[in-house]
Amino acid sequence: MAPAMGNELQHRTVLLEEAVQALVTRADGVYVDGTFGRGGHSRLVLEKLGESGRLIAFDKDPLAIATAQQITDPRFGIVHESFASLRTAMAERGVGRVSGVLLDLGVSSPQVDDPERGFSFRADGPLDMRMDPTRGESAADWLARATVQELTEVIRDYGEERFAFQIAKALVARRAESDRLGPLVSTGELAQIVANVVKTREKGKDPATRTFQAIRIHINQELAELQVVLEAALSLLEQGGRLVVISFHSLEDRIVKRFMQAHASTPAVDRRLPIRAVDLPSPPLKIIGRVFASDAEVAANPRARSAVMRVAERIAP
């Protein structure tokens, strides 16, 4: 197994033991780590697997892929794609069913801590925000063309920012000055534009937090891809297989919670119809529960404070 790299030393995997314990129910199973990151969960899963077990991991980030490629364990494979391609990737590998799917959502510490990636408002850097900088539209490119309405909707819906319209107008006004000032291409300037608009302050939170989150989610299509992978995971899980999802903000957690609840409930029917409960199809999932980081983990890793892990098990064939 590969030694830790510098970025791995900086990255503390949240809910490491709890997630792997919930995920791995059989040592000979086929498991999916939808978000390899720097490999914390994947390495522990491999420790739990027997010789016939298998782990397939996904990540968009080229740096994560480079780390994963150092793992020479024959039971391990890495896919340089979004976890939204889960169904296709499994079909290409001849995998019909899996024993568990783990998703550790959001941005990783190495991504946030590297100003060159453009995720952070705390250090100036290029306004990129792509999980995979080699594909798709950067944040700067999108901000250079988005309308006030588009900006407002993204910042409001994905950032839950009540000053979304005012921020959108300020961004478009800044764009009108591009001939004189040049294009908006730095995280520092974006953060300052937002700070000039958001006059009220949330305790312990930078005024740019919500806007940066919103733009990042939009650029990477995070919520849409989450919906896709949840459906794919449900279709691939074998009976007794586990779906384990760690989320870090309410938008993600709400999607996961509603998905699990919807598939753990018996369909509602009109009570006036002559249908017996035993005639209704069994729900495919059973909700195992949710887990929060311990006080000790939060003290050691403040990022864990907002983490919520939800676990469900496939009970119907």
Swiss-Prot record:
| Reaction(s) this enzyme catalyzes, per UniProt | cytidine(1402) in 16S rRNA + S-adenosyl-L-methionine = N(4)-methylcytidine(1402) in 16S rRNA + S-adenosyl-L-homocysteine + H(+)
GO biological process terms held by the UniProt record: rRNA base methylation
Q: Name one GO cellular component term.
A: cytoplasm
One MF annotation (Gene Ontology) recorded for this entry: rRNA (cytosine-N4-)-methyltransferase activity
Recite the UniProt keywords alphabetically: Cytoplasm, Methyltransferase, rRNA processing, S-adenosyl-L-methionine, Transferase
Q: Where in the cell is it found?
A: Cytoplasm
Sequence positions that bind S-adenosyl-L-methionine: 39-41, 59, 83, 104, 111
Q: What is its EC number?
A: 2.1.1.199
Question: Which protein family is it in?
Answer: Belongs to the methyltransferase superfamily. RsmH family.
The UniProt function text for this chain reads:
Specifically methylates the N4 position of cytidine in position 1402 (C1402) of 16S rRNA.
Give the protein name, as stated in the record.
Ribosomal RNA small subunit methyltransferase H
State which gene encodes it. Answer: rsmH
